[in-house]
Amino acid sequence: MGVTICFSFGGGADHPLSDRAFWDEHMRDSLHMPNGGAAVLVNILCLSGGRLAETESQKRMMVYLAEQNQFMYGLGNVDLDIDSLPWDRAHFAEDKAFMLRVIEGARQKLGWETLRDRYEPNAECVKEYLDGYQILMERMTEADIKDESLTKWLDWHKPDQPPKCGFPKCSKHDAYIALDGCQVCTD
């Protein structure tokens, strides 16, 4: 079992899953990794993003990633597809640039010092995961935004939960906290 990251498949008349060209296009730059690799990817993105996020929409991106916690939801039960992130058309260009900075920060091991007591991510695997994630992020366009994703995601949260109650951070890892706490602490 593992996790595949790509552009998700909306189906519908314009892009039926049975259409081989549609399938090939959307899987062109897909990234497959074992469950442990997905957990490491989320952890290092959360560590980097926790230090880089400034705007509300950037912080929302980090809370969304922190919610992709396989320890809490089960192996393989995370959604890391690029177009599933809570994109906001009004901030798309700056949020995409932010996510590319988060990836670069993870490459530079931003925040990894907080992992010393737990583990040291495998540099070779991390490079492969970050390179693949960057390719997918670079492919993301405003046209790929699913307008309902942000609204549905926000509506799913209660007023006393992140991201609606603000953006609390873990005092140990400086990562944004999701519903189930710090992704890095609980992984």
Predicted regions and their residues:
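Low-complexity, intrinsically disordered Gly/Pro/Thr-rich segments
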Residues: 166-172
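Short Cys/His-rich metal-coordination motifs, predominantly Zn2+-binding knuckles/fingers
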Residues: 173, 185
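Residues immediately within or flanking Cys/His clusters that coordinate Zn2+
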Residues: 167, 179-182
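Non-catalytic protein-protein interaction scaffold segments in large eukaryotic complex-forming proteins
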Residues: 1-84
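Extended alpha-helical interaction scaffolds used for oligomerization/partner binding
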Residues: 47-161
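Residue-level signal for mature regions of secreted extracellular proteins and peptides
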Residues: 163, 175-178
